[in-house]
Amino acid sequence: RIDPERRQWLALSTPSFRDWFTAIMDWREQDRDSRHPIPPYSINDLPDTGLLTAEDLAGGTWLTVNVWAGSSETRVAATLQRNDGMQIDLQPERTQSGAGEAPRIGAEWADPFAAQRQLSVGRYALISREGEGRSQGFEQFKGSRRGPEPPRPQGAVADRNMHLWRARLPDDLAPGVYVAEVTSTDRHGAASTDRLLFELRAERPPRYFRTDVWYGTE
């Protein structure tokens, strides 16, 4: 359950996330009858966005803040604190000025927190042997059917946002565990604070179960 006092959520936009996002969105835009029936990736193919390397920083990694009721009068402040006590101030900027400009659309401007949940929806694949026919996949408004079929994007995806702030992480961060703390303040002075934990390592560990740790074999 979401805390009723909560007003925002945080995420990291990494190069891997943007590549993953772009590939699935490209598939989504293809003709339904001629495209491959299975999307190019699922959520299982997205590398952990809370585990970074220097390569991720060099390619551009942003801390993103979706302030749900954010406006041009909202103020957003952020800090990074490493596990040894070192602290860095970040300067989040709103991705849209809200001055009547065209929306910025695409991986660079997407909300990673929302998009990760929208681009690989598992309930499309729900299926059973003895259940009712209408319980396979899922139903939407007026009984429209979805699935059963491989997990895929839902209808609406957060590929643009009028209340998203972001701050690029420094390229020269040292390895360690970091906590990003973000406070947003609305025009009435009401503040909301959230934190996001991530780790910066020299290299990523293996993604899958390591039998060599247990049995001494690859």
Predicted regions and their residues:
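Metal-dependent phosphoesterase/phosphodiesterase active-site architecture
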Residues: R1-E218
